[in-house]
């Protein structure tokens, strides 16, 4: 088994957390941390950060008070502090924001212990902070292991039987967004109502393929050729397809694997 590398603490290690790969190309890859209704991003072995804030002052007190005008932080936000200047005792690492006001805040470690700067050397300059980049998701920690996904360039299609189909789009390292796409349908069974959300997804021969809703666990939906959100069926070669497995037992489709053929597992 290949070795692993420690990249950072998850947001809450008491909850189930899952890493999902996102690869635009071999030289541009990410690890996505899915936890309890949030997503964080790792790139090149580091946590992706939001905008950097410059610290203009740090008091010698318990707890030490940091000044950064209009910083925008809230209590409980996790930030990475970079220290390349004085007050060397304040190490470059992750902290939690506490005591937040418009222009000032204090810090605790990740266990909630306040950072006491009383005996630290005097601050001069060289300290910045940046919030750990995070996006809200609909998936709870109890659901993340049942999330399935398929990616095309900068867009990932994500499914879970309890949630509407989502897209996850990337426009920059710290610019990701979830959306509920508009799906065109003209036939039943549908994909866009409660108990009709798919559980499995893949790409196959220029089509986006969904499968296994709660109401139709053995049905597959193939999009129109090269038109991934169009599930309009018809008689043309490139129209969408809806296919239900004929079987003596109604075993739900559990996975789809696209190779030279489409492998379907129950």
Name each model-derived stretch.
Residues 1-52, 163, 167-265:
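N-terminal beta-propeller domains
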Residues 46-151, 159-164, 172, 181-193:
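Small/polar beta-strand repeat architecture
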């Amino acid at each position: 088994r290949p070795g692993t590398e420690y990249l950072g603490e998850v947001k809450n290690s008491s909850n189930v957390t899952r890493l999902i790969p996102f690869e635009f190309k071999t030289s541009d890859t990410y690890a996505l941390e899915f936890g309890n209704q949030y997503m964080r991003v790792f790139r090149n072995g580091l946590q992706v950060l939001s905008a950097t804030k410059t610290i203009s002052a740090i008091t010698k007190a318990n707890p030490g008070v940091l000044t950064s005008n209009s910083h925008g932080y809230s209590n409980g936000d996790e930030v990475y502090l970079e220290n390349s200047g004085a007050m060397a005792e304040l190490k470059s690492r992750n902290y939690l924001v506490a005591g937040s006001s418009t222009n000032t805040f204090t810090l605790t470690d990740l266990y909630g212990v306040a950072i006491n700067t009383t005996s630290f050397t005097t601050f001069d300059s060289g300290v910045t902070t940046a919030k750990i980049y995070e996006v809200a998701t609909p998936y709870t920690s109890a659901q993340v292991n049942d999330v399935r996904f398929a990616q095309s360039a900068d867009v990932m299609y994500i499914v879970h039987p309890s949630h509407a189909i989502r897209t996850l789009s990337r426009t920059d390292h710290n610019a990701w967004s979830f959306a509920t796409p508009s799906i065109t349908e003209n036939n039943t069974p549908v994909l866009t109502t409660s108990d009709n959300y798919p559980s499995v997804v893949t790409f196959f021969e220029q089509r986006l393929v969904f499968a296994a809703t709660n109401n139709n666990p053995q049905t597959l939906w193939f999009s129109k050729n090269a038109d991934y959100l169009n599930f309009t069926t018809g008689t043309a070669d490139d129209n969408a397809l809806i296919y239900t497995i004929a079987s003596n037992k109604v075993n739900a489709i559990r996975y789809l694997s696209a190779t030279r053929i489409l492998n379907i597992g129950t």
